[in-house]
Amino acid sequence: MGTFVGVIIVLFVLGSMMALKPNGIDQRLDKLRMTARRLQLNPKLVSCPDWIKGKDNEYGRGMLGQYCLVLDDVQLPHTRYQVIDGQWRPDSSFIDTTKDDVKLTIPSTIRTNNSTNNNNTITKKTNFSLDKAPLDLPVSIEPFVKGLLTKANSIVIYWEDIAYVRPSSNPAYQQKLIEADLLVLKKQLEKWASEMQK
């Protein structure tokens, strides 16, 4: 009887130790995010913005990876893009061109604080130079990209980074390709930022 109790205790301790070990997908995701951090892509796990289709193809549902590249001495327009058919398309809820074709009405949620005196804030139309631009990202990243945001001196890409490391969604995953794929992503973010400055 004492041996039986000893075996149960040992199995319980071993089971507890096995439960503490992170699974393979979590380890891969950690490696991806640490590499992105080293490349100054500033990864974060955020709730899906309400203008992006997230979990179950519903707007604002689920969690996404947010990778932000901060560019020194750069001023980018405040724009949002969604991926439609492998191309960047401006977020239709962000644009209101119904009043005037050359002016853009900024929704009240993103008006600056200095516009408190003016109730109908109107600015020049935002630069949509990335409209219909192809993604041109690695095949292991491109299917998981959801949106792009530019503001001030940063360009942010939203994508399902966990799908990149999950064997069911990316069977061609190889750990040695993480850095190369992220370097291509960083280069594309820099290219898109320079196109928006023209």
Regions found by a protein language model. Give the residues of each.
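Hydrophobic transmembrane signal anchors and adjacent membrane-proximal interface regions, especially
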Residues: 16-18, 50, 104
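Short extracytoplasmic
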Residues: 41-58
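Structured extramembrane domains adjacent to transmembrane segments
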Residues: 60-191, 195
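Short alpha-helix boundary/capping motifs
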Residues: 3, 7, 53, 60, ...
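N-terminal signal-anchor transmembrane alpha helix of single-pass membrane proteins
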Residues: 1-39
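Intrinsically disordered, low-complexity boundary segments flanking structured domains
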Residues: 27-32, 52-55, 134-135, 141-146
